[in-house]
Amino acid sequence: MNSILSTFKPDASGKPPKQVPYIPWLKLNDGNEIPMLAYGLGTANYKTGGAGFDEKIVDNTVMAIKAGYRHLDGAEVYGNEEELGAAIKKSGVPREKLYVVAKIAGNKKQDTEEAFARTLKKMGLDYVDLYLIHAPFFADSDEELQQKWADFEAIKESGRARSIGVSNFLQSHLEVILTTAKIPPAINQIEFHPHLQHGDLLEFHRKNNIAVAAYAPLTPITSDVESPVRTIWSNLSKKYGVSESVIGLRWCLDQGLVTVTTSSKEERLTSYLNHLPAIKLTPREVSEIAEAGKSKHVRGFWKNKFEPETRAK
């Protein structure tokens, strides 16, 4: 599959703590590279419709950038593209040092070019590093999904999106667009954690050289499920001298997955940057967590669209 070719050191203009070590990058199938740890603008930073400009979201994002995060994962449906753009400007870090992700809403029909132009305007940017179809659920036919992907190919060819990809796609959705695609998706961002491992989907990605990004990786901690994974994470946290959250994120990274996390707490964000590069789980530990996770199925997002189809995965 894709391979880690380089490392990322937080730029001095962002004034990160001196002790922040390197974060790896992953080479995508289009030749571009993506930082493997992302700061997400969803969940805690999600803004409900009609809410005004939120300075707290700006401050949270600036904090993440100054801590050393360069991969910023945004989306139209998060409702905070203006705040993301403001944070980029306020951070003082040059645009070219940042990796900005945007997503078109995947649950409604809209003109792709108009939606993308609106996103760029809200963020005050000329381009994004990665543009994703947030979900396939807007499409009533294979042809509609294929046309949306053709729209994305045109945006990439225009230079306004360095890479293009999808999110929340199952193998069946990927097969539809690959049938007609001139440019394959660079990445598929999916909910991924020990309690939702998607069966053979990761192997399909490897065979087709499509990278995977994991969101909600800490579900065993953040959900109310009694997770057997927690016992393993607790034991490993003591072994490696890090938090359970670091173990959970490391489990994804050690499988070659780009990993999206978020927090409004600077200490937690800095801890991830400090500790994640310092440890590596053994193959046996990765496998042990995976097997424990399979004992319970938990999906936190898009339940009404996926269940019960993926309950066993």
Where are the predicted features?
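N-terminal binding-site loop/beta-alpha segment at the start of enzyme catalytic domains
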Residues: M1-K97, T219
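Beta/alpha (TIM)-barrel catalytic core signal, keyed to glycine-rich beta->alpha loops juxtaposed to Asp/Glu
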Residues: Y22, A135-K313
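Acidic (Asp/Glu)-rich catalytic clusters
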Residues: L28-D30, I65, G85-R95, A117-D126, ...
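Acidic-and-aromatic substrate-binding clefts and catalytic sites of carbohydrate-active enzymes
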Residues: Y46-G52, D73-E83, A105-T112, F138-D142, ...
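Short, acidic/polar
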Residues: K47-I65, K108-G124, L145, S172-E175, ...
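A structural motif
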Residues: Y69, L125-V128, A161, P185
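A short, structured active-site edge motif that brings together acidic residues
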Residues: R95-K108, L130-P136, F192
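CE4/NodB-like, metal-dependent polysaccharide N-deacetylase domain
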Residues: E113-I133, A154-S158
